[in-house]
């Protein structure tokens, strides 16, 4: 409101006036009589008046104008009036003892043209005023002294703090410098260490470089020497090959010349009335053989020693053939001469008979000639004991199948799962058999042995055991034997070296679990009857497909497999059988004999030589069997073995050759060359892939 604003203005004006600036003692009533006594007493000078006269009045006189002198006298007369107590000049800071000192220096700055008049109070008031002024002065002096001391202390503290900060800064700088120096030293040490390491590494690299350079130079020299040696060997090989090639051409020329002599002997056929076609046929075969060797040689480069030996064998046979032909011609000539003599004698007798009609005519009986021999054929049937053994194995296999028929034909899902797990546990380890390492082969053997022993094994992330089903053991034994034979039929047929690791595991399992071995033989005889050896006979009323299956052929959709594939499978199974009979598990009991050892291999070889050979089959199986097992049989039977080899060469080869067509001569020639090489070196080589002692340490 407007009135409220004016009220504040009034109060502000009163506060700014002289009375508004006066100091009032609110406690004057407490003093009571002292105040009244002071007012009633006569004025007298205070003991401090001298100080006032000395310090205050001179300043007033200097500053007051002349016109104000009378006013001062008037004011002194008013000292007795207690009602008029003006403000003491000592209250003014300009006239205080402390401010007097400062006013001298700043006189012009604080000097005022108008000075208030000094009114003297009563002596007691002056005393009080002087005490107050004295106290104030002392207080100010003490305050100034305290302030000075405080300032000095603060300055000392500031100096101390400054010195301490300076010292700390120095220490900090020293520590920082020390840290930098230490870091520099560490860095220098690291650099020196790195430099030393780099120098050491450089020296090491230089040494390695020198060593490698030395090795490289040695290798280069060795390579150069090897190259020169290879060049020399290649030159010698070429020279030998060219010499053998020239020899082959000379052999071919001689064979052709002998063949022409065989053809020239055809003129004796009508004259002597003998059949010489067999000699010509065999001569043509030998010419074709030599021509084939030379043709193969021209494709492959130079002839080998085996090629030369085969050609020389053909030449020798051609010479023997021509010699036999000449002997046959001589015998025929002798026979013709004797017949002519006999005819002449008969004619003479007839002429004599004509002269004597009573004599009876005698008709001559033709002679068979000295070269005629009775036909002695080998047997086609297996021995009774072997056949009985074969039938016993097949019956045991059939009984095993019947034993797990419930598990095999079960419709229960749990039983099917158990059957599948058992089959995987039995067959997968056999599929993993390889020549990687002996330790790996031992792990596979231990897993199969544990499974057959009833212990749980891990298969497909699950624990499997034959104890899960009463028929589990029969099922596992049958499937395991079947898988071993299947590996021979497939894996060994493709990779001949695989026969040995599979055979050694099968032999070890056979030794610990004889029933598995019997089932292996049963499966082997069923798929490859020649492993008995057994040539199934065709029975009346038997379907042709069934007979072909009995012979070992695979028949699918009335289609019989190719002969090459059939021979390949038979070869794989015979190789597996030949490896089994000579190998034993190295970690087994050496005190016991082999469950199916080399004596069975000798029996097989003897029995197959006592049977009529089959075209292409007998030669293939004999070669595979002897290549795998020949070295072991040679060490076991020694002289008897070499007699057997000579028997094959001299007596059995002609029988195989007689039934082998020209398109099936490959297996026969391969067998013949193998045996001739063995006879030439008097040793059967160790088969490729045979497991040595170092394999079992891997």
UniProtKB/Swiss-Prot annotation:
It is found in: Nucleus; Cytoplasm; Nucleus, Nuclear pore complex. Associated with the NPC, however it may not be a stable component of the NPC complex since it shuttles between the nucleus and the cytoplasm. Interacts with nuclear pore complex proteins NUP155 and NUPL2. One of its GO terms (biological process) is protein transport. InterPro entries: GLE1, GLE1-like_sf. It comes from Bos taurus (Bovine). Residues 64-78 have a biased composition (Low complexity). Keywords: Coiled coil, Cytoplasm, mRNA transport, Nuclear pore complex, Nucleus, Phosphoprotein, Protein transport, Translocation, Transport. Residues 185-246, 308-356 form a coiled coil. The keyword DNA-binding does not apply. Disulfide bonds: none annotated. It comes from the Eukaryota. Belongs to the GLE1 family. GO terms for molecular function: inositol hexakisphosphate binding; phospholipid binding; translation initiation factor binding. The gene is GLE1. Residues 336-348 have a biased composition (Basic and acidic residues). Residues 656-698 are annotated as: Interaction with NUPL2. The modification Phosphoserine is found at residues 41, 88, 99, 351. Residues 1-29 are annotated as: Interaction with NUP155. This is mRNA export factor GLE1. Signal peptide: none annotated. Residues 63-122, 336-377 are annotated as: Disordered.
